[in-house]
Amino acid sequence: MARSLCAGAWLRKPHYLQARLSYMRVKYLFFSWLVVFVGSWIIYVQYSTYTELCRGKDCKKIICDKYKTGVIDGPACNSLCVTETLYFGKCLSNKPSNQMYLGVWDNLPGVVKCQMEQALHLDFGTELEPRKEIVLFDKPTRGTTVQKFKEMVYSLFKAKLGDQGNLSELVNLILTVADGDRDGQVSLGEAKSAWALLQLNEFLLMVILQDKEHTPKLMGFCGDLYVMESVEYTSLYGISLPWVMELFIPSGFRRSMDQLFTPSWPRKAKIAIGLLEFVEDVFHGPYGNFLMCDTSAKNLGYNEKYDLKMVDMRKIVPETNLKELIKDRHCESDLDCVYGTDCRTSCDLSTMKCTSEVIQPNLAKACQLLKDYLLHGAPSEIREELEKQLYSCIALKVTANQMEMEHSLILNNLKTLLWKKISYTNDS
């Protein structure tokens, strides 16, 4: 009896093992298929996103077609379209309409920017810049004199910057920049390129601040494509992750990761001083005040000497221009009165329209960005004072009495505190 039971058990065991192996095989195949499916989907989405965001070939074709037919001209045109010594490298675009690439021009590294597929009207919800027509580069027209072109540029600056007393000097500066071949004359093609570029706030700011340390230098242009000097580090933080990974990383943990991939504290302090100096540059400069409307780490970079360099200035806009466009905008709450990410005005509920006064000055937004950046790893002997000054800075309001005096005092105190601490360190 016992012997027969044992025999039955031995007979049943292979069937059990076979069933278990079949189950494991099916499970393995299912998970393998799932991995392949998810991986393929991620690759497809990444490729689709890349092809939508990164359209350098289309941009080059549009520009070069216009150059070869004599519509536009500029110092970068021949290198881009004939000798092909200006070429696009890594894509940095975050919007299809604003193409941005690391590039090389005659063996010199640079950043190439180009505008794509943009409508002619002003849309406050997206941009503060008039966009291309279907027929590109239509102004100035053939027969326009240099004097007439100067009047066009003057009127544009008056609309953007307000009635500044020295706009004529800026017009002459633009004519010098537009003369790409340095022959003392501005051709029609060069004028068309310059006019298209002057619609872009970043280009205008690069010209206005061309002698300032923290503004990238303009290397050249062709149409509304332009090349600016390269920046070695294109974010305050040294780690960039694929967007898929970003989805699964909690924001608190992401901030901790960011802090791990930053320079030493004295070097961070030097970068921070650079940002404070840039705020000074755009605050009541020679051609009015500019507002920083996207003060984020991704728009700031630095070079090998840890000098701050602006990477993206497209959301730095003339205050006069912003006020004129926002003041009659319909609103139901303050949330409707925002340009970029952090240029905010208030909503007047009696008229249901946005007011024109921006609430938070550039310095307060810069200090908000620098708070975590500087306090992490700050020397113990200055941490308390540094924190106190940063919070005083963040609390600044445009509407406060004697705001300009407070602005200057806080900015100078912060710079002095940081410089005193790093003046005698090798890292600075």
Swiss-Prot record:
Belongs to the DIPK family. It is a single-pass type II membrane protein. Keywords: Disulfide bond, Endoplasmic reticulum, Membrane, Signal-anchor, Transmembrane, Transmembrane helix. Residues 49-428 are lumenal. It is found in: Endoplasmic reticulum membrane. The keyword Transmembrane helix applies. This is Divergent protein kinase domain 1A. Among the many cysteines in the lumenal domain, most are probably involved in disulfide bonds.
